[in-house]
Structures are given as C-alpha cells and as structure tokens.
Amino acid sequence: NMAVLVIDIPSNQVVAYCGNVHYNTKQEGNQVDIIQAPRSTGSVLKPFLYAAMLKEGSILPHTLLPDVPININGFTPENFNMQYEGAVPASEALARSLNIPSVNMLRKYGIAKFQKLLQQWGLRTLNRPATYYGLSLILGGGEATLWDVTNAYKRLVENIDPSMALRKSQAELQITGNVQGLEKKESF
C-alpha cells in the first residue's frame, strides 16, 4: 500500500491526495484510505526529538552520540544496516536516521515528555500511556495518521527559510517565524 499527501505551504492547500494506489479495486487492502488510517510512524518522529533536545540544550548539531550495541531491559534496537558507527555527530545521526542514537536520546529526554510534545504538535492518535509505547516510540512503535504527521511537519517548515539549504554555512542561515514549542534557533 502507498499513500501521498502533498500540501502547498504558502496557500495551505492540498495539492495531491492519493489515499491508496488503486483505491477502487477489489484487491485486498486497497479500500483503505491510508492518509486517514493510523499507521506506524517509522522514523518520521526523529526530527521532533532532535528539535526538542536542541531547544533544551541537551544536544548540539555536533554533539557526539553513541551508536554502539545496547540492551535496555531486553530491548535491543539495531540500525537498518545492522552496523554500528561508534561516536556520531547528532546532525549525522539524524540525517542517516540511525536508530540507536535516537533510542538513547529518547531515553534521556523521557518518553512521557516526548509523547506530550508530539501531542502538542497535533499527533492525536498517541493517546495511550507512555509506558505502552516505550522507547520503540521513536522507531515506529506509535501510530499516527498521515494528516497529523504532515501537519506537524508543515508547522516546522513554515518557520524555516526554504532557501537555507542552498547556503554554504550556518552563519548565513536565516530562520523566520516561530514554531509552537520551539524557538527560531532550534527549528533549524
């Protein structure tokens, strides 16, 4: 199954909406509008954790995070490639979507605190106790609708100068606006 939701940020209009590949066929699962159905979040929540920890000063982009085998009460997360990188800068861990640094960060930040932040950003389906999700929340252990996830990212994008990706150094970046729960400097 596949779904696509594209929103034009300036106009706040839905540009493309495809709830499933062949929505009207009789093939199993094709009658589900995946945009409105809660699905595993996978790794899409990682940027929100990084932003929250930047805001509180727990990490900086170049903070080294451990990417080594861990076992937390029987929970042994692994990276997608089943390899370990040792010490990795936070910005690289996020860019590469490394699981182990993210789990360690969530452990430090707090699951309940992170869940509350996600709810503030509009993820309405994360309504069970934080203990239900555990550390797997950051790896897809929770569910959200594509509407909610898209709107949360939209809030983030609305407050970042889109041309910053074309600039050469952080010193040249200009952040505009304010993200709910984040200051301008953290939303970068």
Give the ranges of each region predicted by the language model.
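Conserved catalytic neighborhood of penicillin-recognizing serine enzymes
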Residues: 59-114, 158, 162, 177-188
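Periplasmic/cell-envelope proteins involved in peptidoglycan metabolism and beta-lactam response
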Residues: 1-39, 43-44, 60, 112-118
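Short glycine-rich loop/turn motifs
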Residues: 1-4, 11-15, 76, 89-91, ...
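Active-site SXXK
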Residues: 12, 33-65, 93, 152-157
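Secondary-structure transition/capping motifs at alpha-helix termini
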Residues: 9, 24-25, 54-63, 124-127, ...
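Active-site-proximal helix/loop microenvironment
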Residues: 123-182
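Short, charged, amphipathic alpha-helices and their helix-cap/turn boundaries
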Residues: 109-128
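Flexible glycine/proline-enriched surface loops and loop-helix/loop-strand junctions
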Residues: 30-35, 86-87, 95-102, 131-138
